[in-house]
Amino acid sequence: MNQTIIKVSVFLFFIMFIYSGFGKITSFKKKTLGLSKKTGFPYPINELGMIGVILLEIIGSIIIVSYFLDKERTQKYITKEYIRYICLLLLAFMIVVTPLYHPPHKQIIAFLSNVTTFAGLLLIYNMI
């Protein structure tokens, strides 16, 4: 496999998660209120969940991208198991979020977009 193509592909793939994480920061209250309405959980619980998702999307993505951009240097600090764990957390997040925010009977294109993102995460998990 061409390593340059892999590096560029992983970088481009995770831009979406990083952008989404920063979007949640800039509209934190609005996003958290929307989540509270969808889940029915109290607002403080949704705040904690939103903070966790923001950290996962931004920091988790940066860690994975760093790993793929310079494996030799980052393998001293970040193990393959750690990268797999982050991928599994993102996969679990996608499983929960996709039907909640994009029910297929109402938003088939957004739903399929998330399914495709899920497939991309599986490929990245498999490349580690």
Regions found by a protein language model. Give the residues of each.
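Extended, low-polarity transmembrane helix blocks
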Residues: 1-30, 43-59, 63-128
